Each structure stands twice: as structure tokens, then as C-alpha cells.
A protein has these predicted regions:
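Charged, amphipathic alpha-helical coiled-coil/dimerization segments
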Residues: 66-126
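Residues within helix-turn-helix
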Residues: 47-48, 59, 66, 86
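Short capping segments at the starts of secondary-structure elements
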Residues: 42-46
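Pre-recognition alpha-helix immediately N-terminal to the DNA-recognition helix
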Residues: 16, 35-38, 96
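N-terminal leader segment of winged-helix/HTH proteins
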Residues: 1-28
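The alpha-helix within a helix-turn-helix
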Residues: 51
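C-terminal regulatory/oligomerization modules of transcriptional regulators
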Residues: 119-139
Length: 139
């Protein structure tokens, strides 16, 4: 039941974010690329760690990173202590996506605030924060 209840809001969120990024000039980005962007640390992240965080195979994550690298959103370099691993970092172009992404998220939140009354939206956000905190502690 939880999956069914979350499916439509998640799909709507991803669709709206994708449309916003296209409108901001990032038509080459797709929702699947969020698996990379959402899981990158500011100092860079190993592909294996990105894959673990996104709960996907290293090969699938490697393909996403390779595509984003070809487009200039990320760069990868050998890990300083493990030559077998690569560290992925946002490039200047990749960092430029952060502001429009945040603006799009704010726009979605504003739109959803119009679909729920004020108390419902506050409760929705409160419960999401609580769930996020609890799940973060479990990791």
C-alpha cells in the first residue's frame, strides 16, 4: 500500500522537476540522473558509494556517470588512495544545475501547498521530516 500511495506523488515530483530543468535549459538531463546528483558529496564520491546510496548496480551507476561526464556535468578521477576506484565530482556546469533545481523544488512545494490546506501541508512536511530523520539514523 505504501508503494502505491507514494508512486503518484513521486512521479508528479519527478515530472515537474524534469520539466523545470528542461525549461531552465537542461533538456539533456533526465530523472534517472538524479541518482548521481542527489548522492554526490561536495568533495566527490566514489562510483561504488554512489551506487550503494542509490541502491543500484555499480555498472548502472557507471553508465549514468559516464553519460553525465560526456555532457560535462561531472568529472571523474582516480581515487587518491585506491587506484582502482574513481571519484566523481560536479563540474562548473554541474554546479550550475543546483540553483534551478532548488527553484524547481520550491515551485513544486508551492504548487502542492495549493492542493492541500495549510495545516495539511505543515503536517505532511512534518511527517516527511520525521521519517527522513528516522531513516537517516537507520543508515
Amino acid at each position: 500500500m505504501l508503494g502505491v500511495l507514494l508512486r503518484q506523488p513521486l512521479r508528479a515530483l519527478l515530472d515537474e522537476l524534469n520539466a523545470g530543468m528542461v525549461a531552465a535549459g537542461y533538456a539533456d538531463l533526465r530523472p534517472a540522473h538524479s541518482a548521481v546528483f542527489m548522492n554526490l558529496d561536495t568533495e566527490g564520491t566514489r562510483i561504488t558509494d554512489l551506487a550503494d546510496r542509490a541502491q543500484m548496480t555499480k555498472q548502472s551507476m557507471g553508465a549514468l556517470v559516464s553519460y553525465l561526464e560526456q555532457l560535462g556535468y561531472v568529472s571523474s578521477a582516480p581515487h587518491p588512495h585506491d587506484g582502482r576506484a574513481k571519484v566523481v565530482r560536479l563540474t562548473k556546469k554541474g554546479k550550475a544545475t543546483e540553483a534551478p533545481a532548488r527553484q524547481n523544488i520550491s515551485r513544486v512545494q508551492e504548487r502542492w501547498s495549493q492542493l492541500l490546506d495549510k495545516d495539511e501541508m505543515e503536517e505532511f512536511l512534518r511527517l516527511l521530516r520525521k521519517l527522513n530523520d528516522v531513516l537517516q539514523d537507520d543508515r
